């Protein structure tokens, strides 16, 4: 596990943050945990390293200029992006939402341009760390963070440390199969949670519904959901995590059985 200790941060040294996502690219300069500048752009089609990395390097330069800080005071660069990746070596291993990123030595690429320490980490893990240090997780020893965006991912902090797992893919629940007879996900598995419930999946299913002549029903459903936002935990869903066996086997088809298994796994880890 990696230590997640806010006390280790040098509060007066500016740092560069980079977020490489399947939908958006972001760079920022932070000083003492406060945002000094930020540059955002759309990832775009065909997001290969050859197309994206030059844009990111230009965005970093823009963020530094807009932050109005001396370059010789920069302490390091932190890069968050979808896994799988090796945070020790900084090598990226074919993220499903970023085609063409197989075996990319991302840390070495950044080191060719900057004489600064460079840290590469799974984006959901960094989000969990941010929540632990600066958000709702402050004061907690343990937390689970779930992200639902272009994909679905998770990060776990246990006793103040990031849970990496054997190969850095701990809490990658987006690519757990919840329907073994479902459609093939971009990762190659069948019926992944990400394929069925991510932001990308919701957009895909909405387009399919519109193409099938269900646009009016979809709009009515969306209006109802917006009129009644969720403001508290769904009490009906809690037994699925607290007591997975409460999901009776007789009430499940083949696609729902993996959900019970995954719920049991989460409950045991909690």
Label each PLM-derived region with a short phrase.
Residues 31-34, 88, 158-159, 180:
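Short acidic-glycine loop/turn motifs at beta-strand connectors
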Residues 138-196:
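Glycine-rich phosphate-binding loop of actin/hexokinase-like ATP-binding domains
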Residues 3-6, 10-54, 58, 91-94, ...:
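Short glycine-rich, Thr/Ser-proximal phosphate-binding strand/loop in the N-terminal lobe
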Residues 44-61, 65, 72-77, 83-144:
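Glycine-rich phosphate-binding loop and adjoining helix at the ATP-binding site
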């Amino acid at each position: 596990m990696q230590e997640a200790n806010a006390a280790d941060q040098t509060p007066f040294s500016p740092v560069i943050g980079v977020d490489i996502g399947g939908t958006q690219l972001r760079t920022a300069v932070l000083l003492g945990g406060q945002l000094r500048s930020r540059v955002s752009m759309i990832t775009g089609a065909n997001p290969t390293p050859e197309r994206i990395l030059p844009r990111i390097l230009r965005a970093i330069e823009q963020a530094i200029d807009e932050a109005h800080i001396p370059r010789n005071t920069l302490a390091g660069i932190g890069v968050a992006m979808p896994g799988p990746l090796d945070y020790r070596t900084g090598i990226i291993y074919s993220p499903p939402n970023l085609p063409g990123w197989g075996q990319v030595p991302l840390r070495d690429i950044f080191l060719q341009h900057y004489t600064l320490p460079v840290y590469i980490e799974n984006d959901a893990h960094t989000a969990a760390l941010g929540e632990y240090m600066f958000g709702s997780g402050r004061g907690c020893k343990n937390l689970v963070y779930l992200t639902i965006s272009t994909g679905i991912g998770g990060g776990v902090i246990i006793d103040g440390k990031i849970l990496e797992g054997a190969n850095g893919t701990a809490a990658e629940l987006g690519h757990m199969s919840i329907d073994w007879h479902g459609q093939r996900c971009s990762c190659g598995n069948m019926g992944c949670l990400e394929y069925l419930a991510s932001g990308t999946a919701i957009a895909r299913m909405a387009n399919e519904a519109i193409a099938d002549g269900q646009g009016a029903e979809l709009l009515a459903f969306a209006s109802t959901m917006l009129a009644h936002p969720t403001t508290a935990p769904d009490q009906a869903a809690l037994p699925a995590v607290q007591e997975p066996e409460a999901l009776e086997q007789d009430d499940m088809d083949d696609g729902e059985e993996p959900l019970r298994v995954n719920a049991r796994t989460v409950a045991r880890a909690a």
